[in-house]
């Protein structure tokens, strides 16, 4: 299960011995788990949605999936409140949890583990930058198409089953605006709308 980690067998064996494998079902809010604040959490399998909380809303930032093993809880620092960033499981997920003190001790001994930590932080940072640029420069239709393409890639299917309300909440647009945007994409032959799903044509 840990073989995809970009780490040597020695380091992986240490993480196995001292870490804990945790399983979460779809819909679980990771901030509700004390281990999320007390240890470093590495995504092993599944899909997690990262959102930012603003005015009682949760706006989608980006997704994490197991194609790239990564530290999830980059907000696990004294200066960053977990109330700001929300991590929601959208496909059953497996996480490796390592106590904070032990992980920091290991990073001082194993450069590869420190590099993995830095790479994870950079990944989160660049995704936030990219999201900011998207919001600033793209039309609603462009945001919608990018969103649908991301879902298609994550679920490995051109047919995506997702409620209109969820799209509305993720992108922070009204359901009416999302519906109009989807209609425009359909008119431009980018998608086909069905009763309970969306089929991506432009992939």
Locations of regions flagged by a protein language model:
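Short, small/polar residue-rich loop motifs at catalytic or cofactor-binding pockets
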Residues: 16-17, 35-37
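Glycine- and acidic-residue-biased ligand/ion/polar-headgroup-sensing regions
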Residues: 38-51, 66-68
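Phosphate-/nucleic-acid-contacting segments
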Residues: 149-203
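Short phosphate-coordinating micro-motif centered on Lys-Gly-acidic
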Residues: 29-35
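Cyclic nucleotide-binding regulatory module and flanking cytosolic helices
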Residues: 1-26, 65-79
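Cyclic-nucleotide recognition modules
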Residues: 11, 61-119
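Polybasic "coupling" helices that flank or enter modular domains
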Residues: 108, 112-172
């Amino acid at each position: 299960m840990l073989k995809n980690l970009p780490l040597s067998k020695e380091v992986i064996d240490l993480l196995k011995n001292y870490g804990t494998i945790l399983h979460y079902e779809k819909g679980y809010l990771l901030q509700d788990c004390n281990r999320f604040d007390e240890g470093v959490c590495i995504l092993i399998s599944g899909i997690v949605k990262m959102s930012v909380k603003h005015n009682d809303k949760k706006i989608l930032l980006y997704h994490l999936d197991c194609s790239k093993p990564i530290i999830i809880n980059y907000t696990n620092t004294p200066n960053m409140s977990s109330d700001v960033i929300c991590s929601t499981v959208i496909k059953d997920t497996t996480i490796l949890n390592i106590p904070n003190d032990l992980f920091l001790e290991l990073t001082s001994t194993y450069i590869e583990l420190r590099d993995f930590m830095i790479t994870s932080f950079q990944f989160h940072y660049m995704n936030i930058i990219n999201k900011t640029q998207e919001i600033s420069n793209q039309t609603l239709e462009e945001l919608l198409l990018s969103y649908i393409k991301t879902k298609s890639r994550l679920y490995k299917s051109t047919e995506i089953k997702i409620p209109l309300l969820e799209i509305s909440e993720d992108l922070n647009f009204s359901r009416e605006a999302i519906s109009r945007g989807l209609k425009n994409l359909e008119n431009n032959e980018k998608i086909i709308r069905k009763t309970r799903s969306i089929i991506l044509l432009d992939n």
